[in-house]
Amino acid sequence: SDNHVDDNKIDYNYQQFSANPMWLQRLNDKSFAGIGFDFNYSSGEDFDSLDSSVDYSELEESSRSVGANFLLNYDTRDYVLNPSDGRLLQMNTYFYRQFLGSKTDFEVYDLMYSEYMPIARDSDVLAWQIRSRLTHGDVPWDQLSKIGGGSLLRGYNIGRYRDKQMLLAQAEYRMNLTGRHGMVFWSGIGMVADQVSDFSTDEILPSAGVGYRFEVKPRVNLRLDLAFAKNETGFYFNVNEAF
């Protein structure tokens, strides 16, 4: 599909407003359930097709998605911002409907599993994550599933690869050095496609990289990551880990 053609690039400005109030109920000491309301409004302007043949007429339409969402999670992480042990299993489902004010009817199923394993060597951590974002219905352009950015497969410009379905896996070794210094090494793969049945090993997007960590206060790191992806590189400066 056009999502995967490197030449099909469009430059544009993008404005977004979103709100997602949610009520959470603790089920037990490791689990939560939640129900919420999700509102997203997006508009694009100043389009430049950069000599590509892509039809961007859909992007010229503002998008409004309004719906209900439901969350379930199971969380045994020892520290949410920078875990060294435990796991997180989370399912977030969204149901957007025109009778609630949405322009179209569609659903989003966002699934995530993360695990953190302490390593004997100097409190190092092996972390890994599997994530999928599956959609169904008349999905507007701004609600397509994306890969890239500082957490969803570093190295790719977020939004460059987007489609109705997304699947990714990533693993990271977090190494403590002397004092408050540390390093990380990671690799990951991801895919986007129109339908789940269209996922193909021919369309795998690889990512790998190295990062430096500085502990500004206990269990809170500044991170600098250099990521290498397919025909792209990325540099990221953030607080706390990618996942």
Mark where each language-model region is:
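Gram-negative/organellar outer-membrane beta-barrel architecture
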Residues: 1-64, 69, 162-163, 221-222, ...
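Transmembrane beta-barrel strands of outer-membrane/channel proteins
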Residues: 1-3, 35-41, 87-95, 111, ...
